Amino acid sequence: MTPAPAAAPERSAPGTGTVAGRVPAPAPGASVVVVLEPKTARTFPEQDEAPVMDQVGQTFSPALLIVRTGRPVKFRNSDDTLHNVNVKEEGTRVQAFNVAIPTDGVYEHTFPHDGFYRVGCDIHPAMAASLFAATTPYVTLAEDAGAFSFTDVPIGAWKITVYTAGRKLERDVDMTAGATQITIE
């Protein structure tokens, strides 16, 4: 029996490369956010469509939503009961907004700056989620073993930031054509 051919490596567009690596693995039920930011000003393409945080089964879904700063985000209520969405900046607890959303209702908001936000429902206090807003489109959640990757990263100087278990880890990355591997512990 002939073995199956190996998968072709993921290729990036000309003038770009791939950044992949490993960060501390998330604890069970937790998330590790990995952010790749340019060290010099860049413009990024618009997002295809607004991300959505839904309220379904008296739960926010997803539990952690990644959004782009300055771009719209939708908050939807798919339950058959009234909910509200109360969003506060994580560090300062400054309220971003607090709105009631009826059944099948949608509220749209644009986050003005980067960072973590706590999301709750005052009507159902057990409902809680988080949101991370970033200017860069290069934001991902690490896999269970801590692996992550970004494709089509323009060549240049970048900073990678990892948010894990209350810690913030940072490292500079010089992106060259091809693949760049990085481990952050």
What is each model feature region?
Residues 1-185:
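Extracytoplasmic copper-binding redox domains, predominantly the cupredoxin/blue-copper superfamily
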